[in-house]
Amino acid sequence: MASVPTQRDEKEKKNDELATAILKDKKRPNRLIIDQSDNDDNSMVMLSQAKMDELGLFRGDSVILKGKKRRETVSIVLNADNCPNDKIKMNKVVRNNLRSRLGDVVSISSAQLEYGKRVHVLPIDDTIEGLTGNLFDVFLRPYFTDAYRPVHKGDIFTVQAAMRTVEFKVVETDPAPACIVAPDTVIHYEGDPIKREEEEEALNEVGYDDLGGVRKQLAQIKEMVELPLRHPQLFKAIGVKPPRGILLFGPPGTGKTLIARAVANETGAFFFLINGPEIMSKMSGESESNLRKAFAECEKNSPAILFIDEIDAIAPKREKAHGEVEKRIVSQLLTLMDGLKTRAHVVVIAATNRPNSIDGALRRFGRFDREIDIGIPDAVGRLEILRIHTKNMKLGEDVDLEQVANECHGFVGADLASLCSEAAIQQIREKMELIDLEDDTIDAEVLNSLAVTMENFRFAMGKSSPSALREAVVETPNTTWSDIGGLQNVKRELQELVQYPVEHPEKYLKFGMQPSRGVLFYGPPGCGKTLLAKAIANECQANFISIKGPELLTMWFGESEANVRDVFDKARAAAPCVLFFDELDSIAKARGGSVGDAGGAADRVINQVLTEMDGMNAKKNVFIIGATNRPDIIDPAVLRPGRLDQLIYIPLPDEASRLQIFKASLRKTPLSADLDLNFLAKNTVGFSGADLTEICQRACKLAIRESIEREIRQEKERQDRSARGEELMEDELADPVPEITRAHFEEAMKFARRSVTDNDIRKYEMFAQTLQQSRGFGNNFKFPGEAPSAGQPVGGNGGSGGNDDDDLYN
């Protein structure tokens, strides 16, 4: 039966919609979608006749167009029969002036423009290289004569004449900001040409379109910033003061600074940037003075946004600040934030990745009113970011950005930008044989053949890792199931534990249950516990953090627990993530029995581990795998359901598993046809996986030794023969030891030894049997009456999912 949405679900959905309501485009008749124009004239836009009638426009009217980033331009409107009602046709020049693309939405309204007295235009430098003759006579006069073209300050227009295309920029108009160039308008063109770089910089200003994966946060910021700056009367009408400050916090690379720049560009507000450390000065009182000047500048140019980057550098907690300067700066910032005139139209945005190190007084209401967490994006957010970064890239047909987004767990915006860059560089490397560094130019054919492929992205993903985990030893291992011989039941159990929640989350949602997130491997040393953890992390494409128990312990009080917290925080940031505790018994010993433990550090560490495993913090997709060969000394609280609830015994391999281990170890090794691996497996009873691998390594070493000795002998014989002038035989040039033979294994078996004694095995068996008995009902529990026919119970025991005997070594 499908689950019925509850009243609570409906309420949550409504709240979500309200939270992002500000982002929804309001439908208005004058908002139209941009389409490609058939007309190449820079001053013309086309509408359907019906739309012109609806908006009260006539053919030849001047209109003002508003695009992205508060950009405006003016044009003449014409009717076109082939233009749909909801579209507006314009050429590339007009689109660039509006900072818009095909498919974007622009608004159009009638404009009452005056004839201009003066217009000042300047050419772009790279379009007039090598030009001789008068620019005015050749280009500008024919372009403007009798055309009555409307122009807007800041616009760029192109003029074609004398087999050349020249770009001009409108620097100034009188009256400003737009006018019509009439026959008596004076056109000035004196001055240095405008540099292309400066123009490109202006074109590449960031806007809301360049932000991905922060939809909800962007809605909050627009509420807090755009509403007070654009419509302060809203707050006045409802009787509250508009917010003054926003604190953006989150890991490095999530886009905090980018958001602030985009808001400034889109609102058209004055933007003043303070980089935290820059205002510090060695002169007494100068640092505070710099802050005061910044606030005064913003108030003078309101509406304004004051952005303080890395605020933790200038506003640390006063009780922890070492110098007097920091304390004075914090006090100055507090008074300035309070002293901002209520309707001064100045919003302060601050960014930090260490919100807890900022002075508490700054974080109260009335200073930084709202704290917005710019977190690590999910798969949908990552796809948005990838689309933004690849919009100007040439991509091959096989590139599946959705798949790339799904596999880049834990990546922030900066990591994804680096990934795209690395993939593009790899594509260039592949074409390197066609490129000569000494040449001044590169063939157009080579340039056209460049396209980033999925293979390039795969290569880049192999090299990149989430920045949140750079300092932790995080690797996606390259161990696969084929590297592990035997243990089929254990593999299945692990797949259900880790792969299912990552790959089929909807199934858990359907049955309304949280997946189990912890597993403990126990068993004799050398049976593949660590190898299994690596394989599962690789198979489900999760990040993998390996923690060696003793590494967490330090001599400083409280530092060991902080290390545990940091590790779990990093794992949560890079979810889905497998946290692997090797030698768990070193940090999870039963509490209260630590003899000679200074200050009870080991007990505090285990307490921290327990709260992190099953604490108040939502674990997200963090899976904990512990491995130990001393399960008897581990604290029972760690092994309860909800923490490490799946206890899996990794026994010594049976005969079939030993054969699999031999095959896995020797799968890349040339073997002679008469080598009987079945016989080897039959005669290595009681050997662990590590012991069997060691036998293979020793046989390989013996083969290498024999090969080198024979080569030296043959080389000597060859030299003797050539000295006597005799010819070399064909067979003497062949490889002396082409494969590993029975003799090598017979020799290796002389040195083979068991690393696990019968006594050790008995201990593990007893522990496993104790667990079996503590399971209570075993296979005897049944409901009264007939069992439902929907399916038989799977796997009687909870350990390895097979028969009871599978749990133990026979």
From Swiss-Prot:
UniProt KW keywords: ATP-binding, Chaperone, Cytoplasm, Hydrolase, Nucleotide-binding, Repeat
Ranges annotated as biased composition (Basic and acidic residues): 713-727
Domain of life: Eukaryota
GO cellular component: cytosol; nucleus; VCP-NPL4-UFD1 AAA ATPase complex
Distribution of this protein across tissues and organs: Expressed in body wall muscles.
EC number: 3.6.4.6
Regulation affecting activity: The first ATP-binding region has low ATPase activity. The second ATP-binding region is responsible for ATPase activity. ATP binding to the first ATP-binding region induces intrinsic activity of the second ATP-binding region. While ATP binding to the first ATP-binding region appears to prevent ATP hydrolysis by the second ATP-binding region, ADP-binding to first region promotes the coordinate and cooperative ATPase cycle of the second ATP-binding region.
Record's subcellular location: Cytoplasm
BP terms from Gene Ontology: autophagosome maturation; embryo development ending in birth or egg hatching; ERAD pathway; IRE1-mediated unfolded protein response; mitotic spindle disassembly; negative regulation of protein localization to centrosome; proteasome-mediated ubiquitin-dependent protein catabolic process; protein localization to nucleus
Chain residue ranges for the region called Interaction with ufd-2: 805-810
Region called Disordered, residue ranges: 713-732, 777-810
Residues binding ATP 1, per UniProt: P252, G253, T254, G255, K256, T257, L258, N353, H389
Catalyses which reaction(s): ATP + H2O = ADP + phosphate + H(+)
Induction comment: Induced upon ER stress. Repressed by starvation and oxidative stress.
Compositional bias of kind Gly residues: 793-802
InterPro entries assigned: AAA+_ATPase, AAA_ATPase_CDC48, AAA_ATPase_domain, AAA_lid_3, Asp_de-COase-like_dom_sf, ATPase_AAA_core, ATPase_AAA_CS, Cdc48_dom2
Residues where ATP 2 binds: G526, C527, G528, K529, T530, L531
Role noted for this protein: ATP-dependent chaperone which probably uses the energy provided by ATP hydrolysis to generate mechanical force to unfold substrate proteins, disassemble protein complexes, and disaggregate protein aggregates. However, able to prevent aggregation of unfolded proteins also in an ATP-independent manner. Targets polyubiquitinated proteins for proteasomal degradation by binding to 'Lys-48'-linked polyubiquitin chains. Involved in the cytoplasmic elimination of misfolded proteins exported from the ER.
Quaternary context: Homohexamer; oligomerization is ATP-independent. Forms a ring-shaped particle of 18.3 nm diameter, that displays 6-fold radial symmetry. Interacts with cdc-48.1 and thus may form heterohexamers. Forms a complex composed of ubxn-3, cdc-48.1 and/or cdc-48.2 and substrate cdt-1. Interacts (via N-terminus) with ubxn-3. Interacts (via N-terminus) with atx-3 (via RRDR motif). Interacts (via N-terminus) with ubxn-5. Interacts with ufd-1. Interacts (via DDDLYN motif) with ufd-2. Interacts (via N-terminus) with ubxn-1. Interacts (via N-terminus) with ubxn-2. Interacts (via N-terminus) with ubxn-4.
Name of the protein: Transitional endoplasmic reticulum ATPase homolog 2
Encoding gene (name): cdc-48.2
